[in-house]
Regions:
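Acyl-donor (CoA/ACP) binding surface of acyl/acetyltransferases
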Residues: 6, 10-130
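Active-site rim helix/loop that mediates acceptor-substrate recognition in acyltransferases
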Residues: 1-4
Length: 130
């Protein structure tokens, strides 16, 4: 059985929660997690996810000793797939008919970031989210 950890996204200028970033299926044997995020619709397409995602990934790879973070995104969700690309994730493959939604099966894009790649990613300015 795995563990789940979540962080609430709270813009500094409003102090109001607008989403969550988290990991589930934490495999302590091989230091691997599956990431997820949900933001309020009015914050999608803004830099809020990039900032929060970088903070969480920095914590996972830096303080928690995670080796690999995976993300499985519906192939139809262009915005989420683009956000992971901007974070520096590598598209590793396509999981065919891997997610059920609306009574149908849909493909998912498999993304990953490994600790050695993340160490090459520049730090983010974090004062806008806490």
């Amino acid at each position: 059985a795995g563990t789940t950890a979540c962080w609430v996204i709270v813009p500094a200028e409003t102090g109001v929660p607008v989403g969550i970033v988290g990991v589930r299926s934490m495999d302590h044997t091989c230091s691997m997690v599956e990431g997820f995020a949900v933001t309020a619709e009015e914050f999608r397409g803004t830099s809020i996810f990039q900032t929060a995602g970088r903070l969480v990934l920095g914590c996972l790879f830096g303080q928690m000793g995670v080796h690999r973070a995976e993300f499985r995104i519906d192939v139809r969700n262009g915005r989420a797939n683009g956000a992971l690309r901007k974070l520096g994730a590598t598209q590793e493959g396509l999981l065919r008919r891997a997610r059920a939604a609306d009574g149908e099966f849909h493909d998912q894009v498999l993304w990953a970031i490994v600790a050695t790649d993340w160490n090459d990613t520049p730090a983010v300015h974090t004062s806008s989210v806490h």
